[in-house]
Amino acid sequence: VKILLLTRYDRLGASSRLRSLQYLPYFQSLNWQVDQEPLFSQAYLCNLYAAQSTWKDVLLAYMRRFKALTRVGRYDLIWIEKEILPFFPAVAERLLKTRRIPYVVDYDDALFHRYDLHRLWPVRAVLGRKIDNVMRHASLVVAGNQYLADRARGAGARRVEIVPTVIDLDRYPAPVPRSEAADRPLVVGWIGTPKTSCYLHPLKSVFASL
């Protein structure tokens, strides 16, 4: 089996690392060939997290993605994280359907609201139903939770499976019970990004109570 994995990021991106890349050793053990092509580079994320200009990185990212699309015919399956080209109509996904190349699409958050709830009406008008179209034509939609799965089913997806975002317990083993580590501070790991860490702020009181 030959799979082209079109991730959003490389390993520095939490969603790509936890939704697909951590499973690659397992697929390799099945003798599956999985070729990863990230959209955004490590340099892009480093610049983004440092609040530096990223427009050159974005331009290069789209050029790399267009180049990757010229090779889709070599694969049995295309595995897409979220969408092929952000803020573009679903032309690339329709191309796969036209060429009868099956694709699986994975969502770990409500990306569709980036378009259908966008503050600018032209974006809502042109891209508001984009993700629904991507879901509808996918051979499989992998959803991180029930909300995403319901959206996929409502969009007419043929098959939907819920796979929550999890961590690899070989890398992050179960902690020592608190009763055995009362003299040590509680350490909470954040698997998100600096850009999304703001969502932790409303939970300060919860962490303090621990």
Which residues does each PLM region occupy?
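Short hydrophobic "strand-cap" motifs at the C-terminus of beta-strands
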Residues: L6, G144, V188-G192
